[in-house]
């Protein structure tokens, strides 16, 4: 009986939910590709074009590897409180797909911030403390995207396909990790101005946000069980 249950045909709702997961996984590739990419300018661009001394102390570049984790710990309870506030509104919470879109938007704002710093600095070396603001945008993007993306898989994946759908989500992470180095080599190798490369990435992130907002209704129709309404 267990074998028969495992191999039974998927229902229409399950097929729709699988389609939604695959579609959102494509946006996940974009998010994580640009998220991983965000660290490389620190090592190869800002390492030479920023003043890393604060009060006579030279801040190690590696400290910024840990800054995101610290900001996640700080912002985690704050974002949880935000979700509660939104859910308590008369009109209810915003959809998970719009939240994922906002995660991409925060990432795009971070790259715009990168570009603004580079344009405004001219030939000067601005203080490395400015990078803290960039990491704030990076972390906000992660807090909007990562936990909710995992929750999306757990909530809407057919139970007997949960492992496979989790693998599909993981495959998106794998693709992003493989691609971001190539994107950096293409966009930041000197072929384009640093600020223009950052703005282009930001535009892609913003367009992804607009698309997620535009297809929000369609995605909700794919995952919603009419019998539960």
Identify the residue ranges that each predicted region occupies:
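Transmembrane alpha-helical cores of Major Facilitator Superfamily
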Residues: 66, 70, 105, 136, ...
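Intracellular juxtamembrane helix-capping segments at the cytosolic ends
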Residues: 143-158
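Intracellular loop-helix junctions on the cytosolic face of multi-pass helical membrane proteins
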Residues: 1-57, 79, 83-89, 215-229
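Multi-pass alpha-helical transporter architecture, strongest
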Residues: 117, 200-229
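A late C-terminal transmembrane helix in Major Facilitator Superfamily
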Residues: 154-188
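Transmembrane alpha-helices of Major Facilitator/SLC transporters
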Residues: 57-88, 103-111
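A membrane-interface helix-boundary motif in multi-pass transporters
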Residues: 92-98, 126, 185-205
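C-terminal transmembrane helical hairpin of 12-TM major facilitator-type secondary transporters
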Residues: 97-145
